[in-house]
């Protein structure tokens, strides 16, 4: 299995180095749910600004403040502790008057707004995230500048970030140990983390191998394509390749790679043979996903950061802004820019 740091680059290995997250203010994330609170209902959506607090810790503190069980507070995604983040929490408080949430106090946290909502906020129920990153001590400004220009046109590999695999790859190692035994894993969080790490590693491997062929954006017979921003896909046939290639070039369609699991992967013929060969050595992880009935799915191989802009504060410091859809990783953008001395594994998804 290819380690995250050794995955194939789309724009070649960066020539320069830089520092990611010298302080929390260098990594700002603003969650975009894609909808507004309903204004009524048994749930309360709370938008919180936090610095130095992880999401679960804040959710538990909010539950204590509201005198409800911790399981009654949900969120769409984990946000990094060592960053400045805005995100929504959702508390189920039925049949009660609206609590005065402006009185909620927690060091490093501030309630920005809150309103009633009809539905529980579930994990993954967000449109995306807006990022403002500051890279410091950049050793090669010209290289980073050109890479930013290239990323605007060609995007970056849509890799799952190193944080998906845990500190030191602990989640992937757990999955491998589990795959080698039939011992049940009772802890639901461990099950989720380990299965997610296994499937993500296989996806990354397929994309890395496709990049080695230099045809990551070239449609081949049997590729599974999806409309940009959509989840469903269809299979490319030889007769359609020219027209489909035009639509891929126009970023109307995205070529996908497998998220292996039980059931058919989605590709056929040449594309399927390539994907199977790319992960042929990882029989244990594939068997684990099938055994645990994790359904196969698809994910776009390339990621195009939206609203990408940047500003050089000086020759060694650059502020970069962009928006990514849910499930994408800012660190997969950064790794195409610099060889960073920051720690990816400590950046929450």
Curated annotation (Swiss-Prot):
<dbReference type="Pfam" id="PF01142">
    <property type="entry name" value="TruD"/>
</dbReference>
<feature type="domain" description="TRUD">
    <location>
        <begin position="155"/>
        <end position="303"/>
    </location>
</feature>
<keyword id="KW-0819">tRNA processing</keyword>
<dbReference type="GO" id="GO:0005829">
    <property type="term" value="C:cytosol"/>
</dbReference>
<dbReference type="InterPro" id="IPR001656">
    <property type="entry name" value="PsdUridine_synth_TruD"/>
</dbReference>
<dbReference type="InterPro" id="IPR020103">
    <property type="entry name" value="PsdUridine_synth_cat_dom_sf"/>
</dbReference>
<dbReference type="InterPro" id="IPR050170">
    <property type="entry name" value="TruD_pseudoU_synthase"/>
</dbReference>
<dbReference type="GO" id="GO:0003723">
    <property type="term" value="F:RNA binding"/>
</dbReference>
<dbReference type="InterPro" id="IPR011760">
    <property type="entry name" value="PsdUridine_synth_TruD_insert"/>
</dbReference>
<feature type="binding site">
    <location>
        <position position="27"/>
    </location>
    <ligand>
        <name>substrate</name>
    </ligand>
</feature>
<comment type="function">
    <text>Responsible for synthesis of pseudouridine from uracil-13 in transfer RNAs.</text>
</comment>
<keyword id="KW-0413">Isomerase</keyword>
<comment type="similarity">
    <text>Belongs to the pseudouridine synthase TruD family.</text>
</comment>
<feature type="active site" description="Nucleophile">
    <location>
        <position position="80"/>
    </location>
</feature>
<dbReference type="GO" id="GO:0031119">
    <property type="term" value="P:tRNA pseudouridine synthesis"/>
</dbReference>
<dbReference type="GO" id="GO:0160150">
    <property type="term" value="F:tRNA pseudouridine(13) synthase activity"/>
</dbReference>
<dbReference type="InterPro" id="IPR042214">
    <property type="entry name" value="TruD_catalytic"/>
</dbReference>
<feature type="binding site">
    <location>
        <position position="329"/>
    </location>
    <ligand>
        <name>substrate</name>
    </ligand>
</feature>
<feature type="binding site">
    <location>
        <position position="129"/>
    </location>
    <ligand>
        <name>substrate</name>
    </ligand>
</feature>
<protein>
    <recommendedName>
        <fullName>tRNA pseudouridine synthase D</fullName>
        <ecNumber>5.4.99.27</ecNumber>
    </recommendedName>
</protein>
<dbReference type="InterPro" id="IPR043165">
    <property type="entry name" value="TruD_insert_sf"/>
</dbReference>
<dbReference type="InterPro" id="IPR020119">
    <property type="entry name" value="PsdUridine_synth_TruD_CS"/>
</dbReference>
């Amino acid at each position: 299995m290819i380690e995250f740091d050794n995955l194939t680059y789309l724009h070649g290995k960066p020539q320069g180095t830089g520092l990611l997250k010298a302080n929390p203010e260098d990594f700002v994330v603003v969650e975009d749910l894609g909808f507004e609170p309903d204004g009524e209902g048994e749930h309360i959506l709370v938008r919180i600004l936090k610095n130095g607090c992880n999401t679960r810790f804040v959710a538990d503190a909010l539950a204590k403040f509201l005198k409800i069980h911790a399981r009654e507070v949900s969120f769409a995604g984990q946000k990094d502790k060592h960053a400045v983040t805005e995100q929504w929490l959702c508390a189920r408080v039925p049949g009660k008057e609206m609590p005065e949430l402006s009185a909620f106090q927690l060091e490093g946290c501030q309630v920005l707004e809150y309103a009633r909502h009809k539905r529980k906020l579930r994990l993954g129920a967000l449109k995306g995230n807006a990022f403002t990153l500051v890279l410091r001590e950049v050793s090669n400004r010209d290289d980073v500048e050109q890479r930013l220009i290239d990323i605007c046109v060609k995007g970056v590999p849509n890799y799952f970030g190193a944080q998906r695999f845990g500190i030191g790859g602990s989640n992937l190692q757990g999955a491998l140990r589990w795959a080698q035994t039939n011992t049940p894993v009772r802890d639901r969080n461990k099950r989720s983390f380990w299965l997610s790490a296994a499937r993500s590693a296989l996806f990354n491997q397929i994309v890395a191998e496709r990049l080695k062929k230099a045809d990551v954006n070239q449609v081949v017979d049997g590729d599974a394509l999806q409309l940009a921003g959509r989840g469903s896909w269809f299979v490319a046939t030889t007769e359609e390749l020219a027209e489909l290639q035009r639509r891929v070039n126009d970023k109307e369609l995205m070529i996908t790679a497998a998220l292996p699991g039980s059931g058919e992967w989605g590709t056929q013929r040449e594309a399927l043979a390539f994907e199977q060969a790319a992960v042929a050595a990882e029989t244990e992880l594939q068997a684990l996903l099938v055994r645990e009935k994790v359904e196969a799915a698809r994910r776009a191989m390339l990621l195009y950061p939206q609203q990408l802009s940047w500003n050089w504060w000086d020759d060694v410091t650059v502020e970069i802004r962009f928006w990514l859809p849910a499930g994408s990783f800012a660190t997969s953008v950064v790794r195409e820019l610099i060889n960073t001395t920051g720690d990816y594994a400590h950046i929450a998804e």
